Amino acid sequence: MASTTPITMEDLQKALEAQSRALRAELAAGASQLRRPRPPRQRDSSTSGDDSGRDSGGPRRRRGNRGRGQRKDWSKAPPPPEERQESRSQTPAPKPPRAPPQPPQPPRMQTGRGGTAPRPELGPPTNPFQAAVARGLRPPLHDPDTEAPTEACVTSWLWSEGEGAVFYRVDLHFTNLGTPPLDEDGRWDPALMYNPCGPEPPAHVVRAYNQPAGDVRGIWGKGERTYAEQDFRVGGTRWHRLLRMPVRGLDGDSAPLPPHTTERIETRSARHPWRIRFGAPQVFLAGLLLAAVAVGTARAGLQPRTDIAAPPAPPQAPRAHGKHYGHHHHQLPFLGHDGHHGGTLRVGQHHRNASDVLPGHWLQGSWGCYNLSDWHQGTHICHTKHMDFWCVEHDRPPPVTPTPLTTAANSTTAATPATTPAPCHAGLNDSCGGFLSGCGPMRLRHGADTRCGRLICGLSTTAQYPPTRFGCTMRWGLPPWELVVLTARPEDGWTCRGVPAHPGTRCPELVSPMGHATCSPASALWLATANALSLDHALAAVVLLVPWVLIFMLCRRACRRRGAAAALTAVVLQGYNPPAYGEEAFTYLCTAPGCATQTPVPVRLAGVRFESKIVDGGCFAPWDLEATGACICEIPTDVSCEGLGAWVPAAPCARIWNGTQRACTLWAVNAYSSGGYAQLASYFNPGGSYYKQYHPTACDVEPAFGHSDAACWGFPTDTVMSVFALASYVQHPDKTVRVKFHTETRTVWQLSVAGVSCNVTTEHPFCNTPHGQLEVQVPPDPGDLVEYIMNYTGNQQSRWGLGSPNCHGPDWASPVCQRHSPDCSRLVGATPERPRLRLVDADDPLLRTAPGPGEVWVTPVIGSQARKCGLHIRAGPYGHATVEMPEWIHAHTTSDPWHPPGPLGLKFKTVRPVALPRALAPPRNVRVTGCYQCGTPALVEGLAPGGGNCHLTVNGEDVGAFPPGKFVTAALLNTPPPYQVSCGGESDRASARVIDPAAQSFTGVVYGTHTTAVSETRQTWAEWAAAHWWQLTLGAICALLLAGLLACCAKCLYYLRGAIAPR
């Protein structure tokens, strides 16, 4: 009885090795008989390949020299030419008449675990030809009575888990006369692919062996034989099949080979069979690789490479402050010293960790000041104009009488007060005297930071160390390279194994907050690949590409020598896809009108029709958030739409100004003087009361000390700049939403099958044509729909909501459940709250995030000319709870309700065999439009490549399968751009116009987002060359090629002149 334990590949290998040992012993015993020519044999119709005098009921005997000690393997190679010529020269024996049918013989199969296979079902006597005809296959092109050569017989293996792990061995030959001919569709004839060398196996084994399967689990090698392992199901039973793959034509002719094999070329040396010969290309590539490595190593050893992984160190302070360096050099807190990052700092009346309040590039938030000790000794940091300044003050007595601050002609000098100077943490209205400028204005970090003045008092003590420089050296003149510190600046924070680096320190690698520094050639080559275009980049590309080319050459030659090129091609390139013959074919059809496919008859989607009953639901006008503003290089006196008419657009400014719950703010940036008149900081206190005494305005006036005023460049340092922003929720006259209800919806797909038109629906998904029956997997109908026709600024867009709303449940406040007017005059929802305006600097880390609900961010933009600055406005989503808003419509609707998420599945039943390939080339011209992570499908369209169906994936996510040609589908995107699209092989990048969930809202939410136009732009030659480096490179290459061509022409003319008129 057969064992019930499942067979494994290890058991298969052991069975093959045991059988090979038995055959080697059998061949060694009969080696002398194999060398003698055999007499002609009579063909027996019942055995179809066995000797006439052999007992078919006994154990099977393998034919052919398959021992490991033989030089030739006749089981898969033709006889030598001399033997073939000798056999042709002999007179063929007369062919006897066909013998009458004989009783069937037991099959020549055995189990892998020593058990016996079940006896086959009894049936009519068959030979290979009759068995092929009985299976419905056409007869071969050659004479079926011709004796098949014994070396044509090969062995394949078959086992099933449902058969109790019975392991079958099937003996067959690929053809009866040499290489089989190709069928009309370019595949091998199935009648010639399976002709058993013995009686017909059991019927269920034959069905399992002939079951089409296009997937391969693995490629296996046994000696010089190659097998393909497949896993499939037949009638609910899982089968495993190990197919022998043909290597070359059996008769030695030059007939075409199957698609999954390649020509075998001998690459072994006659003297050393194990060696593989290489030619000049391999030697050249190896030399090129060594040269690139040598040059890259030499360049890496000249100077250390630094991998910048963090923002660079703050720029140095101006040279004008260096004169104070000698006074307080020993008291300066530098980066990396104790008590800086890990110390406890005093902020107002509280003590906080330094990491919580330390301002600078290293923490997000606004700038501020902190104290290292008590209030008698204050140390402060200020950031202005992209530079950091340290200000130290020692033992300042309390102020006696405050004295207004007198401003000098520029920011580098200041007047000295007449009384005793006050400490830095005096009141806001107190003045500080005796300070030397250089710190400038600042902004607070915390609300409790009220004891720090708006101006930092104290001496400007900016430390000026020499810049850090490295060098590379060797120990005793031998590798490896070491990094030596020539000069070190403490604030750079370079450390070696956790210890701060000093001049003279030697270390394999230095680490700092800015990145890593090393002299290693390997690290230098790696850094060269990541840097911008340079010679190191080219060398790194050669070093990375050439080894793979050499590896490919080595594997290709080695695999061709071993006869496994078919397996390597199958695994690496496209997978082994045997011919799939059957009565059913399944493919996909995209859902855009005009899509076509082959199944195998041409099928085209002529159109899609949507049928429903429509009920009008009225019209309404939604709220809309609008914002505008201006960047002005002075302080305006009339802050209104009329007073700022030269800077702000008139139409949106008037609409926002007349709206309800508007937010209007004017920020004064670094305003110290205007028109030559001195002004105090209190002139722009929060609320702007002092400013409004002289300039009446309806907007809030806020100071913006510490923000960069570089947008208005071309001024002395005592200039001012103001930013004006205006935002509110308004009812736009050109934005309306009309509601329509659709019931009893149904989608009708109009197909053209080989010229025959038919319509399919969910009730009737079949098409009966003269070529066969087509069954379509139609997606379900969407059901009841709600259509929102959104008109805005002359453009119309329809959004669809699935299902009927539950007006007595959670959808009670939705626009569908409201009573709308036919003329769109009703404004839906309550009046929203006023938006919040915020001035954000251009280098603020806050810009890396998105604005919050109901927030509007304004940022000055530097112009290309003096006195010209712009404004960039960003707005977040709606900041109120009302759901009658455009973003509610986008979140609860879709752009196309009846558009299915995937393609149509087509199952075509026909009488002729069909084979459907699969495309591997990347799709072309793919465009992605919509949003991601928003619950609404995005539109994906492009061109599928030829060669079969394209199983499209976007960033690794399966979208569907499409035939060659144009496709249009909808997919839920979970990742942001860029998007890599692929059909299963090579990938390509798609163009995308998508928005994130925060930006998904009614079109035209922010009417700001504009920049004040600049009359002209200027560009230097260096900037132009940097922007057109690729064209310049190609032009230089073409110029060199043209110069070489002209030189060749000149040389030819020179020799031609000498030939015509020799001297």
Swiss-Prot record:
Write one Pfam family the protein is assigned to. Rubella_Capsid
Biological process (GO) annotations held by this record are:
clathrin-dependent endocytosis of virus by host cell; fusion of virus membrane with host endosome membrane; virion attachment to host cell
| Highest taxon, organism lineage | Viruses
| Recorded GO CC terms | host cell Golgi membrane; host cell mitochondrion; membrane; T=4 icosahedral viral capsid; viral envelope; viral nucleocapsid; virion membrane
Q: How is it modified after translation?
A: Structural polyprotein: Specific enzymatic cleavages in vivo yield mature proteins. Two signal peptidase-mediated cleavages within the polyprotein produce the structural proteins capsid, E2, and E1. The E2 signal peptide remains attached to the C-terminus of the capsid protein after cleavage by the signal peptidase. Another signal peptide at E2 C-terminus directs E1 to the ER, with a similar mechanism.
**Ranges for region Human C1QBP/SF2P32-binding:** 30-69
Where are the residues of the annotated region Functions as E2 signal peptide? 279-300
Q: Compositional bias (Basic and acidic residues) spans? A: 70-87
Region (Disordered), start-end ranges: 23-131, 305-327
Any domain commentary?
Structural polyprotein: Contains two internal signal peptides that are necessary for directing translocation of the glycoproteins into the lumen of the endoplasmic reticulum.
The name this protein goes by in its record: Structural polyprotein
